[in-house]
Amino acid sequence: MEENNLQCSSVVDGNFEEVPRETAIQFKPPLYRQRYQFVKNLVDQHEPKKVADLGCGDTSLLRLLKVNPCIELLVGVDINEDKLRWRGDSLAPFLGDFLKPRDLNLTITLYHGSVVERDSRLLGFDLITCIELIEHLDSGDLARFPEVVFGYLSPSMIVISTPNSEFNPLFPSVTLRDSDHKFEWTRMEFQTWALYVANRYDYSVEFTGVGEPPAGAENVGYCTQIGIFRKNGGKATESCLSEQHDQHVYKAVFTTSYPSLQQERFFKLVLVNEVSQQVESLRVSHLPRRKEQAGERGDKPKDIGGSKAPVPCFGPVFTEVEKAKIENSPTPFCVGDKFFVPLQRLLAYPKLNRLCANEEMMRSVIADSIPLSSDGSAVVADLRNYFDEQFEF
């Protein structure tokens, strides 16, 4: 449940008017971005597959995390259904996601519900985040919160951030940073609570934060304090999870899936496109050599100089090992007006090699989309096409 960060400088929700502009503490980047970046850095480091953000608010953190290639399931939970419906579309795939599919599947779901309710669809997660959430809970919900999140959901890692009240005196006329906050803890209060919860539910915890204090006020600590909880022994086993009864109390208000190379139609689309591009690149690079050979035989090839010459395309930069692998692979060749590129040659290129494990796999995927030689060992293309003639190439 994220705080408002007005004018990208205030950390005081709803109280910016009370803080004189000349005394407002400036955070660069803004504090809310520092919190999100902190979570993203953890995701980059630990590569969780299943991530849930409790109290996801306007889904800003989810939008930041959805581009991470390791995540396969991303879930947001919030009590404000209207906000979830309004922001859901911002999590849907864009055109670029279809043009360049992810390696792994990604499903994003937004649930309307309370974080102190048990829903079995959030079992077995690698990471659950609670960014600026707990201070919005009343005493009853705060008591139930550990039972649900740590005891029932029991993810591998939990990140909880909350305001550090020791920082508040640096903001003029501020007691609580948001009118909806039920409390704000000192570092000692937060750490006492966190250590008790960690010990009870078999987690370890370490403390850090974001939002450096100004010079001369280092003793107050970070503006936002953060606890990182790690499950001792890792994630709950599949057998333990299977013993949990299904409880679907949350209401799904938005869900979307991203195209990926794990989906047959998108894998084929990408592979056919990559093969076609590589064959075309090899064909075009082969034409000047053909003209040189024609000149040696006494033929008179057309002039390729001047403005009609096509602009050369710059391909990827290969390592010495990759270059050697390509050079040692079967060479493209011509038979009459046809240009042949062996599949083994294509598989020598790193990008295609990453997509396809072997020649048989490549052949089976592209056979009905790209012309192949009679024995299926090479892609066949016309040596010259309409555009070559137009450019007198």
Swiss-Prot record:
Instruction: Look up the record and name the cofactor or cofactors this protein needs.
Output: Mg(2+)
| Pfam families for this protein | Methyltransf_23 (PF13489)
GO process terms (BP): piRNA processing; RNA methylation; siRNA processing
Instruction: Give GO terms: molecular function aspect only.
Output: metal ion binding; O-methyltransferase activity; RNA binding; RNA methyltransferase activity; small RNA 2'-O-methyltransferase activity
Q: Where is the composition biased (Basic and acidic residues)?
A: 290-305
Region feature Disordered, mapped onto this chain: 286-307
UniProt EC number: 2.1.1.386
Which keywords does this chain's UniProt record carry? Cytoplasm, Magnesium, Metal-binding, Methyltransferase, RNA-binding, RNA-mediated gene silencing, S-adenosyl-L-methionine, Transferase
> Where along the chain is Mg(2+) bound?
132, 135-136, 181
Coiled-coil residue spans: none
Q: Which domain of life is it from?
A: Eukaryota
Q: How is the cofactor bound?
A: Binds 1 Mg(2+) ion per subunit.
Q: At which positions is S-adenosyl-L-methionine bound? A: 36, 55, 78, 83, 115, 131
Reported function: Methyltransferase that adds a 2'-O-methyl group at the 3'-end of piRNAs, a class of 24 to 30 nucleotide RNAs that are generated by a Dicer-independent mechanism and are primarily derived from transposons and other repeated sequence elements. This probably protects the 3'-end of piRNAs from uridylation activity and subsequent degradation. Stabilization of piRNAs is essential for gametogenesis.
PANTHER family, per this entry? HEN1 (PTHR21404), SMALL RNA 2'-O-METHYLTRANSFERASE (PTHR21404:SF3)
Q: What is the protein named?
A: Small RNA 2'-O-methyltransferase
| Source organism of this protein record | Homo sapiens
Instruction: Report which gene this protein is encoded by.
Output: HENMT1
